[in-house]
Amino acid sequence: MAIIGPTGTGKSQLALDVAERLGPLGAEIVNADAMQLYRGMDIGTAKLPVDARRGIPHHQLDVLDVTQTATVARYQRAAAADIEAILAAGAVPIIVGGSMLYIQSLLDDWSFPATDPRVRARWERRLAEVGVGELHAELARRDPAAAAAILPTDARRTVRALEVIELTGRPFAASAPRIGAPRWDTVIIGLDCDTTVLDERLARRTDAMFEQGLVAEVTGLLGRGLRDGVTAARALGYAQVIAALDAGGGDEQLRQAREQTYAGTRRYVRRQRSWFRRDHRVRWLDAGACSPPRLVDAALGAWRHVS
């Protein structure tokens, strides 16, 4: 089973509830949130602490230092190996997350085009000249679908997408397989809810992150090299707090960081919705209208119908 959908819809809690309900069958959770791969990035990614995981094994959490680069290809290999091992043990893998390319690469066994250092270097020079915002806008003109899935602040993935487009002469998404039967016959459950309801959840979520110590978490990670990280430093919340600290770290700068984090998360949710809604295999559930037990019933009903 895969549980996907926009940020803030309750995917992690549903995964825990489903795993508990499966009981004797055994279930293990495989993370598909790119920023939860990083050790120490806990508050800003809403990562479940160990004591909240109900004794259920979790995979692909805390596997990278913040100075390491997260790549879809590395994740695909590692997560697929985890899933194969879980299945071999007779248990049920539950993939959970909202990182669009990570999920598609895993469920559709995406093959990644080769890279060309000269082409990559040319786009990196262009990045240095015009900045990531202009480069992302260029990607949006060439391949709107790829731009929708890549954060406007994500220089590395923007460069990679433009490199693939130049090398293949096709949109970046064209290197993905056609949507067919998902790998491992995975049942894909989508969680979403009314925009007004989700906006309120995101506002509370953002406030909670700052109140629970996001600024202190970022400060500690800066001492471990966060600023040098190609992908970790650009994560929502972390990038905004870094900018606020660089500007003096006063109350006004941190207030702006909080507002920018909320606004950036809402924009990211729109991209997630656009991406996931194109996948006809997703069985959507209303996280705002259904009680947790009903969500579990619906998810397991869909899974049992297929399995």
Swiss-Prot record:
Q: Does the keyword Transferase apply?
A: yes
* Recorded catalytic activity of this chain's protein: adenosine(37) in tRNA + dimethylallyl diphosphate = N(6)-dimethylallyladenosine(37) in tRNA + diphosphate
Q: Can you name this protein?
A: tRNA dimethylallyltransferase
Q: Please provide, alphabetically and separated by semicolons, the GO molecular function terms listed in this UniProt record.
A: ATP binding; tRNA dimethylallyltransferase activity
Binding-site list for ATP? G5, P6, T7, G8, T9, G10, K11, S12
Q: Any idea what job this protein has?
A: Catalyzes the transfer of a dimethylallyl group onto the adenine at position 37 in tRNAs that read codons beginning with uridine, leading to the formation of N6-(dimethylallyl)adenosine (i(6)A).
**Which EC class is the enzyme in?**
transferase
Q: Where is this site: Interaction with substrate tRNA?
A: S99, R120
Keywords attached to this entry? ATP-binding, Magnesium, Nucleotide-binding, Transferase, tRNA processing
List ligand-binding residues for substrate.
T7, G8, T9, G10, K11, S12
Instruction: State how it assembles.
Output: Monomer.
Please provide the Gene Ontology terms (biological process) for this protein. tRNA modification
Listed cofactors = Mg(2+)
Give the Pfam families listed for this entry: IPPT
The entry sums up its family as follows: Belongs to the IPP transferase family.
Q: Does the keyword DNA damage apply?
A: no
Alphabetized InterPro entries for the sequence: Dimethylallyltransferase, IPT, P-loop_NTPase
The EC number(s) attached to this protein equal 2.5.1.75
